[in-house]
């Protein structure tokens, strides 16, 4: 688990899967720059990279749905709400789901897709939803803007060295 220093938000990153190598510092940088882009202040954010079995189990526990999924978001404190510590939420991501979704991919495409899953969860923490077609369109637009910004700042996920 990697934790950012105390002067910044604490970004807890945990890689509990072995399907895809994840550089924890790149995940940390992605979250920090995303928060800066969105002008969100928080004390803590949690991101867990899980295998399909663990994510399906969590999916069943939280939503009574044992099917595999790509990401689960558990928002905790809404942005702008006073609490200490302010915990924006938890993101649970399956890198293997990105492998399945893409079928054939380059390394860059795979890490871009996994980065999209993290951004998607972070957007849910900010209150974005994807239940209606209009919500999905707005979410996709926000994902694309965020991913472009992160790519421009070399802050997408990358493999561990």
From Swiss-Prot:
Its main location: cytoplasm. Binds 1 zinc ion. GO terms for biological process: rRNA processing. It is an enzyme of class 3 (hydrolase). One of its GO terms (cellular component) is cytoplasm. Its cofactor is Zn(2+). InterPro entries: MetalPrtase_cat_dom_sf_prd, YbeY. Its EC number is 3.1.-.-. It holds the Pfam family YbeY. SUPFAM superfamilies: Metalloproteases ('zincins'), catalytic domain (SSF55486). GO terms for molecular function: metalloendopeptidase activity; RNA endonuclease activity; zinc ion binding. It is found in: Cytoplasm. Zn(2+) binds at residues 120, 124, 130. Keywords: Cytoplasm, Endonuclease, Hydrolase, Metal-binding, Nuclease, Ribosome biogenesis, rRNA processing, Zinc. It comes from the Bacteria. Single strand-specific metallo-endoribonuclease involved in late-stage 70S ribosome quality control and in maturation of the 3' terminus of the 16S rRNA. HAMAP family: Endoribonucl_YbeY. Belongs to the endoribonuclease YbeY family. This is Endoribonuclease YbeY.
